[in-house]
């Protein structure tokens, strides 16, 4: 086996706890083997109808991946390739999936919500 087989992808997630921000994201940290599926979850602030998924890397800075309004994707132009997908089946829950994960996916991922 080559060294890539054992390469791990580190995905750090910025999580807002039960504070004024109110957005809940899980898991807090995710480390996975290359090729595995990663699912990030976000619960927006109750009553907010817009949800945003972001990715931040040292090389590219902050990037908007996808934006939902009333559970409908409005702008997904930042979603890289076909390995990334996001859903918002209802107003209280969204997921961001990466499958299969690759080393270049290492970043800080976070979501935000607004009225």
UniProtKB/Swiss-Prot annotation:
Disulfide bridge partners, by residue number: 42-111
Chain ranges of the Ig-like domain: 22-115
Annotated transmembrane regions: none
Key word Cell membrane present: yes
Example of a GO MF term: MHC protein binding
Record has Signal as a keyword: yes
A biological process from GO: immune response
PROSITE patterns named in the record: IG_LIKE (PS50835)
Residues the record marks as carrying a glycan: 90
Signal peptide: 1-21
Keywords for the protein's UniProt record, in alphabetical order: Adaptive immunity, Cell membrane, Disulfide bond, Glycoprotein, Immunity, Immunoglobulin domain, Membrane, Receptor, Signal, T cell receptor
Compartments in which it is found: Cell membrane
Domain of life where this protein originates: Eukaryota
Summary of the function given for this chain in its UniProt record: V region of the variable domain of T cell receptor (TR) beta chain that participates in the antigen recognition. Alpha-beta T cell receptors are antigen specific receptors which are essential to the immune response and are present on the cell surface of T lymphocytes. Recognize peptide-major histocompatibility (MH) (pMH) complexes that are displayed by antigen presenting cells (APC), a prerequisite for efficient T cell adaptive immunity against pathogens.
A GO term from the CC aspect: plasma membrane
InterPro entries xref list: Ig-like_dom, Ig-like_dom_sf, Ig-like_fold, Ig_V-set, TCR_beta_variable
Protein's recorded name: T cell receptor beta variable 12-3
Subunit structure: Alpha-beta TR is a heterodimer composed of an alpha and beta chain; disulfide-linked. The alpha-beta TR is associated with the transmembrane signaling CD3 coreceptor proteins to form the TR-CD3 (TcR or TCR). The assembly of alpha-beta TR heterodimers with CD3 occurs in the endoplasmic reticulum where a single alpha-beta TR heterodimer associates with one CD3D-CD3E heterodimer, one CD3G-CD3E heterodimer and one CD247 homodimer forming a stable octameric structure. CD3D-CD3E and CD3G-CD3E heterodimers preferentially associate with TR alpha and TR beta chains, respectively.
Gene (UniProt): TRBV12-3
Pfam families per the UniProt record, alphabetical: V-set
């Amino acid at each position: 086996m080559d060294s890539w087989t054992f390469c791990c992808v580190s995905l750090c997630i910025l999580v807002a706890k039960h504070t004024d921000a109110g957005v809940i994201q899980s898991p807090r940290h995710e480390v996975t083997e290359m090729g595995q599926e990663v699912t990030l979850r976000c619960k927006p602030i109750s009553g907010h109808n817009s949800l945003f998924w972001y990715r931040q890397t040292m090389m590219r800075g902050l990037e908007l991946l996808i934006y939902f309004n009333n559970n409908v994707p409005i702008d997904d132009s930042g979603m890289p390739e076909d390995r990334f997908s996001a859903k918002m089946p209802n107003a209280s829950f969204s997921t961001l999936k990466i499958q299969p994960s690759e080393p270049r996916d290492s970043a800080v991922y976070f979501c935000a919500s607004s009225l």
